């Protein structure tokens, strides 16, 4: 299973009837929980709704017989699958995923759409949005696969609820197939989308020697570095007077904001950069004559 914000590509390999829930079935349940994080909040978690999913996952982890399950007051959820006999002394390995979703696109009333035997060329969603190979070349490799998307009017939330689904399905698979393993540590965190997912992460409670974050896209890919950015906010105060008598007096805050943005290198934006090249990304802007703001990462 791998995923983008609006698309989950799914191919289930196991035919073991003992597995109670497949990963995609868990994902379809998890996306019914609305969990956007809020970058303007000063609390942890930044949105109380993340606790609703956390409590649901805690109950599921109890049903999977995990031990040392802890949901702390900052919405970090931890648990362990004890080592099988003879594997108690090997290093514990951990798996991490985050519960929050982005807040800058519609994230409620999500309607998943399952498309079987994808044609490998384009996919038109019920809301009228078309995903094409021209815009997303990787789609060409998915011919014949089953895709799970939103209906195009919302996000799907596969980032990172698909990661949660994969981890708990793996836990179930290890137990029901009696696969030998060392201690498996699990953690589900809040507020990753606003850069705060690790802020209150309790490494001691987690307990892993090594760990993987299950949050990516290309199938089989392992990333050993992570995205890193800083935030820059400009707040501009203008001077507003009647435009009929404004000569040499008015300072239009919106025009000043435009000047600031135009002073930045035109090609040093996400569209014009790659790999380790830095960029200035104008996330949002607002303004009038009296006040204006620019928000960058």
Where are these regions (language model features)?
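N-terminal capping segment at the start of a domain
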Residues: 22-48, 148-149
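Active-site metal-coordination/substrate-binding segment of hydrolases
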Residues: 87-180, 188
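A non-catalytic alpha/beta surface segment that caps or lines the substrate-entry region
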Residues: 42-90, 94-96, 100
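Short, Lys/Arg-enriched N-terminal segments with co-localized hydrophobic residues
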Residues: 1-20
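Buried hydrophobic packing segments
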Residues: 57, 166-174, 257-261
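Catalytic-loop motifs flanking and including active-site residues across diverse enzymes
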Residues: 53, 159-166, 253-256
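Midchain, well-structured core segments that form catalytic/ion-binding scaffolds
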Residues: 145-158, 191-297
